[in-house]
């Protein structure tokens, strides 16, 4: 046989002598398959499952520092209560867990601490975790969900002391040489919401209103709460002290002035601050400027 060759552009092809070249549709043999397997495509899973959503976490440490003399400035050392939110995470789409510590107490009076959750509802929420009283509960008589972490932060940080022992905890380098020497009291608030959207909203740090209670309710007088600037008191907090002493946030029906904001001083100062960072903020020591 004769080997036939031909070229197209710069390419060259050769045909074996036993191979015949025919015109279109003139071949005498028909090839049904090339491999013996007919590929009909992948029909896929008829009932595919949605992929699980990844867990969400916030690793910023939020340190809150409070002065307990509101509406007066007091010594304004901002170490009367130090609390940190160390971690927030959402698991199983709907469960928000907040973990933190009450780290230091420089107050000389009985002081409590709580968290008010804004722009969310407690309806249908399952609550678990750990606070001073045991398992956290939503406080009754509140429009917003409120959880009290402790009614006596001195006792929570140092359970061995008496209920009326208000010795400083981790703020005084002189008294026993104790300052910034431990984690204090741990707390955890876990809320399982009806929807993932509600859990994400509750995780927004702007919706987490940490506050202290510097004086308990007495008779018809509601308790004295101290919040960060422009956060309103809870339903159980007094409004009678707004506009008094160094406070200029006149949310008090007996006052004529109409300044806006809560817990703001006449000089624009605050009784509560929040410091976001990658680590716990180093709070001021006692008797130090």
Describe the role of every protein-language-model region.
Residues 1-289:
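Extracellular distal adhesion/interaction modules in secreted or cell-surface proteins
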């Amino acid at each position: 046989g004769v080997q036939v060759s031909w070229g197209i552009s710069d390419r060259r092809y050769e045909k074996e002598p036993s191979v015949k070249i025919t015109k279109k549709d003139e071949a005498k043999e028909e090839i049904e398959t090339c491999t013996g397997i007919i590929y009909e495509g992948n029909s896929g899973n008829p009932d595919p499952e949605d992929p699980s959503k990844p867990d969400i976490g916030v690793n910023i440490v939020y340190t809150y520092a409070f002065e307990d003399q509101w509406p007066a400035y007091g010594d304004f050392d901002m170490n009367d209560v130090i609390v940190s939110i160390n971690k927030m995470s959402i698991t199983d789409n709907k469960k928000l867990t907040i973990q933190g510590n009450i780290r230091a107490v420089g107050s000389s009076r009985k002081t409590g601490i709580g968290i008010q959750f804004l722009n969310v509802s407690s309806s249908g929420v399952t609550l678990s975790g750990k606070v001073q009283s045991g398992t956290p509960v939503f406080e009754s008589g509140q429009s917003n969900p409120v959880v009290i972490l402790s009614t006596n932060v001195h006792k929570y940080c140092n359970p061995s002391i008496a209920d009326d022992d208000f010795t400083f905890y981790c703020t005084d380098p002189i008294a026993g040489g104790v300052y910034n020497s431990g984690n204090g009291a741990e707390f955890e608030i876990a809320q399982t919401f009806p929807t993932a959207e509600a859990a994400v909203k509750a995780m927004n740090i702007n919706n987490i209103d940490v506050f202290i209670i510097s004086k308990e309710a007495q008779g018809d007088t509601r308790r004295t709460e101290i919040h960060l600037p422009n956060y309103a008191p809870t339903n159980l907090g007094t409004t009678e002290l707004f506009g008094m002493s160094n406070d200029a946030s006149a949310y008090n029906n007996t006052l004529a002035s109409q300044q806006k904001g809560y817990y703001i001083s006449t000089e624009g100062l605050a009784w509560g601050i929040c410091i976001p960072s990658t680590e716990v903020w180093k709070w001021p020591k006692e008797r130090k400027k």
